Amino acid sequence: MKKYCPNIAGIVLGLLFIMSAVMVLFHLVKMPPPPEGSNMAMFFAAFGPTGYMTFVKIFELTGGILVTIPRLRNLGLLLLGPVIVNIIAFHLFVAANPKGLIDPILSPIIMLALYLLWVGRKNFAGLLN
């Protein structure tokens, strides 16, 4: 069982990011607009036209695919790490809603990523030396 948990966690985390990226890149879901004049509206107004959101979603797609493949999981975590940190920062500072961190989608993403980092901590130890 211990052998399969990281694989299951990697597949679930990868699929969450793959689905998120595909939905945005191929315009499968229309996102409701944020309230006018809010920090979120200004944030997304800057991200949309510049193409930065597309860049982030391509990273999410690539990282999600890599996390689902056990041999490439750590590379995928290296790509997804900054994305996850930015999602957390968005909820804390832009949306100004710390309760957003217990979102039913965001909480499992954070927990799965932390679990996979813990499982692969020996592989990441070389980066700290």
Predicted regions and their residues:
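Extended, low-polarity transmembrane helix blocks
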Residues: 1-28, 69-129
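Solvent-exposed, well-ordered loop and adjacent helix/strand elements within mature globular domains
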Residues: 19-55
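Core segments of transmembrane alpha-helices
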Residues: 57-62
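C-terminal ends of transmembrane helices
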Residues: 65-66
